[in-house]
Regions:
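Short amphipathic alpha-helices and their capping loops
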Residues: 1-34, 57-105, 112, 125-127, ...
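AMP-binding/adenylate-forming domain of the ANL superfamily
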Residues: 14-31, 52, 106-112, 157-158, ...
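Generic non-transmembrane alpha-helical segments
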Residues: 59-66, 167, 171, 251, ...
């Protein structure tokens, strides 16, 4: 059934709609300075090829204006104790910067993109979205988007990028696009009776009761004083070779498991193999779009769900996968249960501001990797910089088609001020080791580990050895034997996902800190060999400027000018 009628016209003739429980929770999180940056969903696309910037601005503007959620304004109705929103506000106006003509340096543009990605929104006054088109040159353009999570989930991001693509092609051709007419987000939210919710909460609580509310991570925590508290994050990634991937997925298929379930099993197994815990609560995001009417609606329908995984001393990989499948199906069925109510029953001493029962999360990585405006203009998504994280550890799983076959890609997001990168890398290596054991010894007990091979040390003071090390990593990642030292990674067949893997492998092999932006600036084998000759300096956390575009532009140039 549809939700209760809107609260009607206010004295200013606005029509207000009740926010969902998830949106209300996000509105509360947005009031906390520490958690506020985690409520943003930034996307940066780098286009290579000719771009009609007038057409792109028109496409972005129309995409931002046509969806009610992206015009929303929020307020707290104190009398009803209800967060509510209206959708009759003006949409965000995309900005345009000709960085080449105005003499912006790469560093200044990077500063601006970081600021656009981190600056908060005033949910009461501003549209919960911003966009900037940045012309870098005749064949290079950036599109920086940022939308508040309160109106935008992972599915919405794909929809918005697709809208921009369709609208751009139509604008460039001088024709009207064919687009759907999405319903208002408030019209597709089902309202449930309190009695039904209470009964379902009781069932979930009964299923999860007794499991520890914490997960013991095998990662030493860095002691910090309160002034250093931050949720600035980083990501490490790896992927299994096609042969191992095929064997892993064949075993998973025998137990009816999806790639997501494989990720949960690998995480639980690795935690059990590296620590004393055997009973885990693991969070994951559920799309929440069971109603077909939500198919074309940009909005926040996602919910956080928790599943339970236990591991016995004699459980084989087949046993673990079967347990994960059953637990996952139970969690899917109860995905509409409010997590805050479950958390309150199981962990009354929790931080009420951030209620999930688990500090670890597993998600299927379905983010788009490319956005092609036209056949001659390709776009790839840049890695997030900055990245903000709410969980102690978030595992993302993706089954990727590559030229040499399907690869199971795994990435770990973590807070950089809490965990050392080397320790997280060790845990990622342990995840790979677990995957290899699953593929090779599925009938063996999970807690019976195979022997790990040792790596051969490389003399990083030897320029020839550094070059050969980087060449070997490129050959491994690109699946190519002939690697030129002076050709960029992307011209050699790399993409953004493989770049993330390259960052991880260079850091792992060299023992040096390697950053994604470093590889953009040193895209060749020879450049990266020089890069790992010395450890990279740690990047400073960017300060979140006010959301005003003029202030962001000025701040970006000020930072860049100070560095020159």
């Amino acid at each position: 059934m549809l939700p209760a009628a809107p609260h009607g016209a206010s004295p200013s003739d606005h029509v207000w709609y009740p926010a969902t429980r998830v949106q209300q929770g996000m509105w509360v999180l947005d009031r906390d300075e520490l958690l506020r940056p985690t409520q943003l969903v930034p996307t940066v696309v780098e286009f290579t090829g000719p771009v009609d910037h007038r057409a792109l601005l028109s496409a972005v503007g129309r995409a931002l204006s046509r969806h009610p959620s992206l015009r929303a304004r929020f307020r707290l109705d104190v009398r009803r104790r209800q967060v509510e929103y209206r959708t009759d506000g003006p949409p965000a106006e995309p900005g345009f910067l000709d960085a080449e003509a105005e003499g912006w340096t790469e560093e200044e543009v990077d500063n601006l993109v970081r600021a656009l990605s981190a600056a908060p929104f005033d949910l009461a006054q501003d549209a919960p979205a911003r966009a900037e088109v940045i012309r870098m040159g005749a064949e290079r353009t950036l599109l920086a988007l940022n939308v508040h999570h309160i109106v935008f989930d992972g599915v919405s991001r794909g929809m918005l990028l697709e809208d921009i693509q369709i609208l751009y092609r139509a604008a460039a051709a001088g024709v009207e696009p064919r687009l759907s007419a999405p319903p208002h987000p408030a019209s597709v939210v089902a309202e449930r009776a309190p009695e039904e919710i209470a009964e379902q909460v009781a069932e979930v609580v009964d299923r999860l009761r007794g499991a520890p509310a914490e997960v013991l991570l095998p990662l030493p925590r860095t002691p910090l004083d309160g002034s250093a508290e931050s949720l600035l994050g980083a990501s490490l990634a790896t992927s299994l070779d096609p042969g191992t991937t095929a064997r892993v997925m064949a075993v998973a298929a025998q137990e009816g498991c999806t790639p997501f379930m494989v990720g949960v099993a690998l995480l639980a197994a690795t935690l059990a193999r590296t620590g004393p815990q055997r009973d885990f609560l693991i969070a994951f995001a559920w799309p929440g779009r069971d109603d077909p009417d939500t198919a074309d609606v940009i909005g926040m329908f996602m919910t956080t769900v928790v599943l339970r995984v236990t591991l016995g001393p004699e459980d084989t990989w087949h046993d673990l996968l079967g347990d994960v499948r059953v637990s996952g199906m139970e969690a899917f069925v109860d995905s509409d249960v409010p997590l805050d109510a479950v958390s309150a029953a199981l962990n009354p001493d929790r931080n009420a501001l951030w209620p999930p029962l688990s500090p670890v999360l597993v998600n299927l990585d379905e983010a788009p990797r490319s956005v092609d405006l036209t056949p001659g203009t390709t776009g790839r998504l840049r890695p997030l910089d900055p990245m903000f994280v709410k969980y102690d550890l978030a595992v993302f799983v993706r089954l990727e088609d590559t030229p040499d076959g399907r690869r199971l890609a795994l990435s770990l997001d973590y807070p950089v001020n809490v965990f050392d990168t080397g320790d997280v890398q060790d845990f990622l290596n342990a995840l790979r080791h677990s995957a290899a054991d699953l593929a090779t010894f599925p009938e063996n007990p999970v807690l019976e580990e195979s022997v790990r091979p040792t790596a051969t040390a490389v003399d990083l003071d030897d320029p020839a050895a550094r070059l050969e090390l980087v060449r070997s990593i490129w050959r491994e990642i690109l699946g190519a034997d002939d690697i030129a030292d002076d050709i960029s990674f992307f011209e050699s067949g790399g993409d953004s996902l493989l770049l993330v893997l390259l960052v991880e492998r260079l850091g792992q092999a060299s023992g040096r800190e390697v950053r994604t932006m470093d590889l953009f600036r040193s895209p060749t084998v020879s450049g990266q060999a020089d890069l790992i000759a010395a450890a990279a300096e740690p990047a400073a956390a960017p300060a979140a400027a006010a959301g005003d575009r003029a202030a962001l532009l000025a701040a970006a140039r000020t930072q860049g000018g100070a560095a020159r």
